[in-house]
């Protein structure tokens, strides 16, 4: 069985979403289906079909979250050996050796990734290229823009 890495914060966020889906969305959709049924003929009842579609999406997401939580490998950065290497959960600053542009990223699980707030998936090309590296290491990473050479500036276990 494949383990699904996530931070403690990521686990809490998924648990909150699951709770919301089960206690708010599921009952709301069930009520919408019941109201749509009262309108009669279900063959041409757009409200009914829309509510059933919402129900399918909601139940699918519930199953998805339950599966991920069931196989979660929660990794707390503070509990890791702080050996200066890039691993899941660390915050890493890298510098593009061509442009001298610096970026700082936190390496997180797939569901936690949000590039707008500099959280990248452990399965992203950048994270995969950085895993195992330490401060001062140079690495070539294939990105959508082509191959880019970076230097690991800092690794923080925050």
Curated annotation (Swiss-Prot):
Function summary: Necessary for efficient RNA polymerase transcription elongation past template-encoded arresting sites. The arresting sites in DNA have the property of trapping a certain fraction of elongating RNA polymerases that pass through, resulting in locked ternary complexes. Cleavage of the nascent transcript by cleavage factors such as GreA or GreB allows the resumption of elongation from the new 3'terminus. GreA releases sequences of 2 to 3 nucleotides.
SUPFAM superfamilies: FKBP-like, GreA transcript cleavage protein, N-terminal domain
Family membership noted in the UniProt record: Belongs to the GreA/GreB family.
Gene that encodes it: greA
InterPro entries listed in its UniProt record: GreA/GreB_C_sf, TF_GreA/GreB_CS, Tscrpt_elong_fac_GreA, Tscrpt_elong_fac_GreA/B, Tscrpt_elong_fac_GreA/B_C, Tscrpt_elong_fac_GreA/B_fam, Tscrpt_elong_fac_GreA/B_N, Tscrpt_elong_fac_GreA/B_N_sf
PROSITE patterns: GREAB_1, GREAB_2
Keyword Acyltransferase: no
Identification of the protein by name: Transcription elongation factor GreA
Domain of life: Bacteria
GO terms of biological process kind: DNA-templated transcription elongation; regulation of DNA-templated transcription elongation
Pfam families found in the cross-reference section: GreA_GreB, GreA_GreB_N
NCBIfam families: greA, PRK00226.1-2, PRK00226.1-4, PRK00226.1-5
Cysteine disulfide partners in this protein: none
PANTHER family noted in UniProt: TRANSCRIPTION ELONGATION FACTOR GREA (PTHR30437:SF4)
Keywords in alphabetical order: DNA-binding, Transcription, Transcription regulation
GO MF entries: DNA binding; RNA polymerase binding
